[in-house]
């Protein structure tokens, strides 16, 4: 293509110029800028190619581990957990053990240990996991026990086999199960506000079911499985709309179990598509499908995922709500992209159709690649891994800042991709 440009340019110059001297001058005047332009074009293409080639989950994980390790040494108190970095700050603001986000930081540390094998990071993970034990043995005043305990003790048990961790997990599952209302068939969300809201079920709560499924397979009551399956079923039937977008909140009559209405709490409007809620659905229903082998849960994850992917903006990272009125100037939500990537990778491992399997893996890889770009990757800007997450826009809370759960799901997605790449490399070696 570059050669054709030169030939075309030279031919036109030869035709137009009568004077040989003037021709040479004119050629020089035109060729030099052209050569400069083409050179820049080559450099630009090479740079773009280099950026694509250089994205490696293993490389990014290595960089992230170094940053996480450095950050852990600055969080002095084991009962204070990073949550967000406000605008103008470079270090994490922390919350106590009872905040719903308390499990994400120890979860990040466990992922960093899994990626590196660094024993000093393991010690940090153990240190920040220990305080969450109290959640498992206290009355359930928070439905997010799965986020809090499974992401801390769950990873700890998976990576160490510590029997004490297992007992904490089993107790946490029993505690979460106390929020189940058999009249409705779902776990109560926001139990501390039950006088105001009666029985609500939010889409986020799908992510707490993994704790129940795990416990039922590891020495807990089979009732825990039944509760988790019922909750997923009620959520599927009532919170997933005909257009495949998801209500944030479903309100039910706590006595009759009747569905009253779907509404939002953190989205733009009741009928809008709140980005992170949609991704909780992708991932949550994929987990439910994996644990129950129910095709309707798998189909729900697929249609929710397809609706999400079909509505993504050009760079692939969703705005906080797909129907926010100020798009394209609305804040993005990198955390939703991270959750989506994990859900899509889970979904890719469940579908049998090879084309669909590749579609969801490619979509997840693209999301993580964009999150790893200079637009979203924090680098040296602050202690977080990712920029541009949005927590609760209607309350003007945590808007366009780093939030800890974005980093958690980013680390999970990177680890998943690394394992997929290693498996593919291993297969290629066998074939050769």
Identify the function of each model-found stretch.
Residues 31-35, 350-353:
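Membrane-interface junctions at the ends of membrane-embedded or membrane-associated helices
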Residues 39-40:
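Short, linear, compositionally biased motifs with a strong N-terminal bias
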Residues 20-34:
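Bacterial N-terminal signal peptides that target proteins for export
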Residues 13, 49-432:
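Glycan-recognition and catalytic cores of secretory/periplasmic carbohydrate-active enzymes
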């Amino acid at each position: 293509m570059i050669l054709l440009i030169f030939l075309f340019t030279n031919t036109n110059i030869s035709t137009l110029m009568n004077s040989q001297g003037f021709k040479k001058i004119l050629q020089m005047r035109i060729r030099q800028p052209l050569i400069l332009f083409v050179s820049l074009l080559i450099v630009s293409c090479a740079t773009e190619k280099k950026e694509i080639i250089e994205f490696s989950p293993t490389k990014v994980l290595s960089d992230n581990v170094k940053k996480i390790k450095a950050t852990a040494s600055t969080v002095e108190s084991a009962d204070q957990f990073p949550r967000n970095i406000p605008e103008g700050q470079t270090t994490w603001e922390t919350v106590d053990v009872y905040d719903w986000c308390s499990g994400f930081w120890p979860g990040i540390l466990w992922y960093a240990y899994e990626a590196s094998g660094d024993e000093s990071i393991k010690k940090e993970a153990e240190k920040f996991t220990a305080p969450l034990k109290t959640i498992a043995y206290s009355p359930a005043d928070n439905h997010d026990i799965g986020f809090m305990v499974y992401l801390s003790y769950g990873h700890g048990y998976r990576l160490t086999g510590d029997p004490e961790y297992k007992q904490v997990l089993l107790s946490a599952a029993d505690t979460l199960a106390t929020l189940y209302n058999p009249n409705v068939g779902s776990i109560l969300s926001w139990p501390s506000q039950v006088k105001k809201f009666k029985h609500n079920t939010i889409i986020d709560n799908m992510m707490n079911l993994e704790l129940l499924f795990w416990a039922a397979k590891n020495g807990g009551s089979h009732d825990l499985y039944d509760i988790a399956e019922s909750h997923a079923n009620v959520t599927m039937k009532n919170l997933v709309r005909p257009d495949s977008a998801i209500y944030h909140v479903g309100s039910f009559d706590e006595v009759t179990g009747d569905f009253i209405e779907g509404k939002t709490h953190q989205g733009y409007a009741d009928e809008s598509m709140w980005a992170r809620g949609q991704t909780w659905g992708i991932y949550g229903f994929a987990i439910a499908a994996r644990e129950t082998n129910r095709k309707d849960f798998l189909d729900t994850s697929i249609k929710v995922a397809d609706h999400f992917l079909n509505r993504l903006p050009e760079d692939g990272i969703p705005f906080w709500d797909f129907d926010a009125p100020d798009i394209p100037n609305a804040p993005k939500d990198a955390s939703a992209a991270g959750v989506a990537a994990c859900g899509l990778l889970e979904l890719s491992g469940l579908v049998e159709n090879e084309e669909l399997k590749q579609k969801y893996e490619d979509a997840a890889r693209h999301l993580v690649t964009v999150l790893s770009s200079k637009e979203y990757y924090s680098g040296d800007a602050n202690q977080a891994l990712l920029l541009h997450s949005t927590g609760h826009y209607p309350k003007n809370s945590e808007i366009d800042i780093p939030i800890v759960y974005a980093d958690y799901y980013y680390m999970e997605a990177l680890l998943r991709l690394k394992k997929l790449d290693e498996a593919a490399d291993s297969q290629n070696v066998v074939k050769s």
